[in-house]
Amino acid sequence: MAQIRIHEINTRIENEKEVQLFLQKEDVLYEKWDISKLPAHLQNNYALTDENKEEILTLFSNEIADVSQRRGYKAHDIISLSSATPNLDELLINFKQEHHHTDDEVRFIVSGHGIFAIQGKDGRFFDVELEPGDLISVPENVRHYFTLQDDRQVVAIRIFVTTAGWVPIY
């Protein structure tokens, strides 16, 4: 279950209902998908083959189709980041630059953890700490950045309206 940390006052929201209500008020889509159907050989696997990626996409094809139909998304892929990722530190420096997109930024966490820092409607930033099973959609034109948690690894399904709209605007 995702948790929230509000930067300026270092307040945490950990209760499931309170997290959902907070994100709903910020117009951030949050869903919890059933991660238990992920087979053991794909759990915490950060060296995915093309076949592994296709298997993950197939496992979650109904959920991807549902959210895509509801929200107008048209494309998806998988990203895997870990200590084995070439230039991981350089990638994380880029990811941590505050930016926005002209489309939603949608991620479903398959393995590992990630943090989206999002600028709230009041101008304050808050972290959404994500774990396997969490889906988040940062609305278009909302300032944010992404980083990893202490384990420095994540596998995520990325879902797009268009890949062109996903280009960051710094």
Swiss-Prot record:
Site feature: Important to generate the dianion: 107
Pfam families per record: ARD (PF03079)
InterPro entries xrefs: ARD, ARD_bac, RmlC-like_jellyroll, RmlC_Cupin_sf
Catalysed transformations (reactions): 1,2-dihydroxy-5-(methylsulfanyl)pent-1-en-3-one + O2 = 3-(methylsulfanyl)propanoate + CO + formate + 2 H(+); 1,2-dihydroxy-5-(methylsulfanyl)pent-1-en-3-one + O2 = 4-methylsulfanyl-2-oxobutanoate + formate + 2 H(+)
CDD domains: cupin_ARD
Disulfide feature: none
This protein's pathway: Amino-acid biosynthesis; L-methionine biosynthesis via salvage pathway; L-methionine from S-methyl-5-thio-alpha-D-ribose 1-phosphate: step 5/6
MF terms in GO: acireductone dioxygenase (Ni2+-requiring) activity; acireductone dioxygenase [iron(II)-requiring] activity; iron ion binding; nickel cation binding
Site (described: May play a role in transmitting local conformational changes): 104
Annotated site residue numbers, May play a role in metal incorporation in vivo: 98
Binding site residues for Fe(2+): 99, 101, 105, 144
Binding site for Ni(2+): 99, 101, 105, 144
UniProt keyword annotation of Metal-binding present: yes
Subunit structure of this chain's protein: Monomer.
Name this polypeptide is given: Acireductone dioxygenase
Known EC number: 1.13.11.54, 1.13.11.53
Cofactor(s), names only, from the UniProt record: Fe(2+); Ni(2+)
Cofactor note: Binds 1 Fe(2+) cation per monomer.
